Design a protein with these regions (language model features):
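Bacterial N-terminal signal peptides that target proteins for export
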Residues: 1-7
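Hydrophobic h-region of N-terminal signal peptides that target proteins for export
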Residues: 10-20
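Generic detector of short alpha-helix boundary/capping microenvironments
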Residues: 9-10, 30
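Non-catalytic cap/lid and distal C-terminal segments of serine-dependent acyl enzymes
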Residues: 21-143
Length: 143
C-alpha cells in the first residue's frame, strides 16, 4: 500500500511539475532584396513565450562555409537548454555559400542585407526580443 501511494505521489509530482523547454522553430523568411525565402532556425527560451513573456536578447549565430540553418543545433544540441538558462533567443540563418556579403553582380546573393536588416526586422516583429541594437549580438563559425 505504501509503495502504491509513493508511486502515485511521484507520478503526480512529475505530472504537475512545470516543464520548461525552449521552442525550436524552422522558418522560411522572405528576403525582399534577394526575392527568395531563406531557411532560419530560431531557438526561443521559455521566458519569451506565453502570457508572461519577457523581452530577451537575440544572438545571431552564423554557420561556416558549407553549413546550413541547422548547423548550430547539430554541433550544439544543448542550445535550447542554454537559451532557457540564459534567456537568449538564438537565430540561425542559412547563409548558403555566401560568406554573408552582398554580391555586386548577383542579386540572389545579398546575405549581408538579409542578416543585418531584413532578418532583424522579421525577428523583432515575430518574437519577444529586446528590439534595439543593445539587445542583439552576432557571431559565427569560421568568421
Amino acid at each position: 500500500m505504501k509503495k502504491n501511494r509513493l508511486l502515485l505521489i511521484a507520478l503526480l509530482l512529475v505530472w504537475l511539475a512545470p516543464s520548461f523547454a525552449a521552442r525550436v522553430d524552422t522558418l522560411l523568411v522572405k528576403s525582399p532584396s534577394m526575392n527568395k525565402e531563406i531557411k532560419v532556425v530560431v531557438v526561443t527560451p521559455d521566458a519569451a513565450l506565453g502570457k508572461k513573456a519577457v523581452s530577451c536578447p537575440a544572438v545571431y549565430l552564423l554557420h561556416g562555409f558549407g553549413g546550413h540553418a541547422k548547423t548550430w543545433i547539430e554541433i550544439k544540441p544543448n542550445l535550447p537548454q542554454i537559451a532557457d538558462e540564459k534567456g537568449i533567443i538564438f537565430v540561425c540563418p542559412d547563409g548558403s555559400t555566401s560568406w554573408y556579403w552582398d554580391s555586386p553582380k548577383d542579386s540572389s546573393f545579398r546575405y549581408e542585407t538579409f542578416v543585418s536588416s531584413e532578418l532583424v526586422k522579421y525577428i523583432d516583429g515575430h518574437y519577444k526580443t529586446i528590439a534595439d541594437r543593445k539587445g542583439r549580438a552576432i557571431t559565427g563559425l569560421s568568421m
